[in-house]
Amino acid sequence: VIVACGINPSYGKYDAYNMALSVVDEALRNLVAGGGDIRHAALLDNFCFASPDRPEVLGDIVLASRGCYDAAKAYGVPFISGKDSLNNEWTDDKGNRHPIPATLLISAIGVVEDARRCVTMDLKRPVSDLYLVGLTRPELGGSEYLKLLGLKTGVVPGVDLRTAPRIMKAMQRALRRGLVLACHDLSEAGLGLAVAEMAFSAGIGAVIDLTFIPYRGGIPRPDFILFSESNTRFLAEVKPENARAFEQNFTGLPWAKIGRTISLTKLVINFRGKKIVDLPLRRLRQRWLRKAV
């Protein structure tokens, strides 16, 4: 049995519908990355909102519910239970009300057919290929990157409900065939955080190039590519001898070989012939721990 979750209240501040789509997608891609199968999975919801007596809150509940419905229909994964926690707000000593943002926690539960085929997210060895599966867009509304910059703008990530289930099933197939050494879904802070976590968790370095990443939505900016939080994306480590089979597995879907693992304990990121990041894993891990704590 495998259990996975998805939640992002930052999205709920701006777009309750796409927040719901995003957290369902996050729960399912976490389930897939861990070795689960969405064909044998189910969903549970937990609605956490302010007072539904306020029209804007009730509207967000309706939009989030619609997002849950659309996602469940698209993925073919049913909701089997759920709960709500409403009226989450408080009043300060000046009489000002402070509601929580629209928040939806999605839990996915499924079955792992063969636990021996499960992989973890840490890199496994030097001289492997790194693949990014899924399409990147300039979707940064509610993102960790814009929060760091103090900006309240941008588009909350949506979900391509036609393509997303195909990507999930293709990744399941690749994992089931033993083509993947390590797998990490892309969520908060996007590719930048995912590749860093995979590298410093194992003490194995990586070199990636943002130039080759499938990108749609205007002029590519390296910071947007690196920190976009577009949904339905995976970063996978693959043995060179399995590269061809892995690529054929994703025929007709967006993917790119974006780099490789290296024996040096550092992360290098290039874009259009220029090195934009060259940092030791030790420093990345220290900064990550500082943020996590």
What is the meaning of each model-derived region?
Residues 1-138, 143-157:
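Glycine-rich phosphate/pyrophosphate-binding loop regions near the starts of catalytic domains
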Residues 57, 64-71, 75, 80-105, ...:
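Glycine-/charge-enriched secondary-structure boundary and capping motifs
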Residues 19-23, 167, 191:
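Catalytic-loop motifs flanking and including active-site residues across diverse enzymes
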Residues 19, 121, 168-171, 198:
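Detector for methionine-enriched segments
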Residues 132, 145-183:
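A glycine- and small/hydrophobic-rich beta-loop-beta segment
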